[in-house]
Amino acid sequence: GNGRLGAMVYGTPGIEQIQLNEETIWAGRPNNNANPNALEYILKVRELIFAGKYLEAQTLATEKVMAKTNSGMPYQSFGDLRIAFPGHTRYSDYYRELSLDSARAIVRYEVDGVQYQRETITSFTDQVVMVRLTANRPGQITFNAQLTSPHQDAMINSEEGNCVTLSGVSSLHEGLKGKVEFQGRLTARNQGGKIACTDGVLSVEGADEATIYVSIATNFNNYLDITGNQTERAKSYLSEALVHPFAEAKKNHVEFYRQYLTRVSLDLGEDQYKNVTTDKRVENFKDTHDAHLVATYFQFGRYLLICSSQPGGQPANLQG
């Protein structure tokens, strides 16, 4: 994530799925669900609590203090980026990594003697999701990519310049019609091979390497103003990101992230299990008391907050 966007990489070789979030996609619309009569009863609720009459306090609060209109609007996902790689269902030497040092997700594996790598960043500096696809032999990058959405009325189109768009609006919730409008834009830049865009599917065939770009934006300006232009915003993010080569974009992204990460370090001793995968280290923790894993979890928590909320944006949600 980069504070505004989030990308969850599943890492399946044959069909990669990357769930996409944008921080302002919420169901319903801006509204005030505060109970206007709440103030009158809050003091009485407090008195009941301090008197140890908890059930009475709860009953009174539910009846007189809680909202009567709705329980609040839920956060919603934008959708998924799905990338199909023909012939990649039978693979070997699979490896995946989330780099807490550089905020990158990496997947590597081998198919028919060819080594493939996917490197995903949600760029802090370019405000788009990038997926870098490489192989150790030329002409081996072939895929079909598309955007999908759980929103029933989402519209998918192909545009000039080998670009797929997905446009929609947030869902109805508790009687409030969704009014947060959003658009995602998908394109790619390839070296060698062919690229085409037909019926909402972006296809690359026989490339030496390629980079997939996803831009997402909404009409949200602030809590009371959703009159922004999501299409122009998504176009702007994408066009500005395409100016930079991936190597430069990654360098800028990592440098931005590390200015937060390196503020704090935690050393709990030597890493005695560096050759053991993280899932096994968690499983074995009750026996190993793996101190380095504790330090890693500490930094993982910091990584999550850095990547889920940035200055000027929304506070991190789904933290319960």
Which residues make up each language-model segment?
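Aromatic-residue-lined binding/catalytic grooves and analogous aromatic/hydrophobic interfacial grooves
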Residues: 1-320
